[in-house]
Amino acid sequence: MQEVIAGMLSPPAFSFPTKVLLLAEMNRKIKSMKEREIVMITIQGLYNTAVCYTPELEEAARKQIQTVCDQAEFAGCKIRIMPDVHAGKGCTIGTTMTIQDKIVPGMVGVDIGCGMETVELREREVDFEKLDALIRREIPYGREVRDIPHALNAEIDLTHLRCTDQVNLNRAMRSIGSLGGGNHFIEVDRAEDGRLFLVVHSGSRHLGTEVAEHYQNEGRCALWGGAQYQVQAAIDQLKAEGRFQEIQKTIKALKKEHELNIPKDLAYVEGKLFEDYIHDMKLTQQFAMLNRKAMVDVIMTGMGFTAVETFTTIHNYIDTDAMILRKGS
């Protein structure tokens, strides 16, 4: 067990040396499952079955999982729900599943590549007032970005994005090295043996939002755009022929003919759009990793810290080697 001895949430809420239990609710569930026989929940849908590794499941999360299992595009995928499951946008946080030839950009979400950069520090004591001042002065949070792009911009070329015309490249470049908002944080943890760990939790900032929303909209247009075009063409033709009394009946018939039982949040991309999304998602994941490393660089340099070991964990991404999606799990 670790304890947080200093931390900064975004917006900032810095406290020291206050003891805060890490992931208290998650630990409670894990302890509960260890103390008794593990109970898994199985949710059967029209096209798939999800296995939930938890004895407890809120109703909103259950409904979202059921909806995913009822979609034909997920037939054949392996769906596993982690113990930290809770309702999210489009699908539950805690979703892990295999991907085939279709992907819902909204399931990865707008914070593509969100994760944590962890650095074991050689130091055993930290001047927290100095650290607090450094973070507030040098690391933008909320909607703010850097005035001058961080040097790590040299390690990525965002002009390679296939949706580059949908992205504010200048803002993206100045976002590397910024914390963002929501549940993102910077903290120092102490292990039971006294070692200190710097942890930075952040993602792809507004770039991830731009990429995700572009492909989600493209997916919706691909699925429903043709139907909208046919409806408008029929209306124009009926007006030209003076058959105004038939317009409403024709609209109703065409909408019924092209009706799709797919929630808008689960609109998927396939084919060329699938390839383009995977390409841009991987580049955005690299951006998120560099963003965290840039913040670590600012802190390590400003504080004069020495790193013993560094590692990254990601919890909002698709492993493109194994084609496995992880949504906050």
Q: Where are the predicted features?
A:
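Glycine-rich phosphate/pyrophosphate-binding loop regions near the starts of catalytic domains
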Residues: 96-97
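Short, positively charged and aromatic/hydrophobic N-terminal segments
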Residues: 17-31
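Targeting/processing segments of secretory and organellar proteins
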Residues: 1-5, 13
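A generic, well-ordered mixed alpha/beta core segment in the N-terminal half of proteins
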Residues: 105-160
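Domain-length cofactor-binding catalytic modules of enzymes
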Residues: 38-67, 74-81, 87-93, 102-105, ...
